[in-house]
Amino acid sequence: MRWDSLTDDANTADSPDEAADADGPDATATADGTGATRATGPAALFGAGAVTTRTIDTPEFRGITFHEVRARSLVNRVPGASRMPFEWTVNPYRGCSHACVYCFARRTHAYLDLDTGLGFDSQIVVKTNAPELLRRELAAPRWTGAHIAMGTNVDCYQRAEGRYRLMPGIIEALRERANPFSILTKGTMILRDLDLLTEAAGVTEVSTAFSIGTLDEDA
């Protein structure tokens, strides 16, 4: 999957290779007064207003660039050859500020023409329409209510979630449809949504799992 498949109005580029660095010599950008820029020219793979690149100069987000996109789809089917114990996943973000050096998902950033090292840690793609898109996909006649796994590629409760708050809407959409789901995280921010998770568990199967990075209490 490349940058163009992340947006719902990509119509200005001839090829995925035009997803070049927005700071390139042929690119221009306009600021909107909020620390955001919108790429135009050859960098504008997504069409007018389809992607916003944003940096936020606060301690918790320093060094991180957010690429806000409107995704075309959210529920992903796991390839049949996979040995994963689930068939469907949801990832509202791409890239992860947890910066785990062992993360197997790093190579997926290459599909977006982004760096798989530091870029994976600091260039975060945010699917800003994730909750509304999930509601639409769960309501589709072809959807059978299968289990959805989250946190399989990147952590849904990484630092970006503190700003964008996509997970409450996602959990609510799953609860409304009584659709079973699971979450894998190492982020304590999941506690913010404990009430929502409890409500969802009252109507469907909900499971959470936690990745423990160290047993050293002083680390």
Place the predicted regions along the sequence by residue.
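Flexible, acidic/Gly-rich N-terminal and inter-domain linker regions that tether
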Residues: 1-89
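Conserved Radical SAM active-site core
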Residues: 57-94, 101-209, 214-218
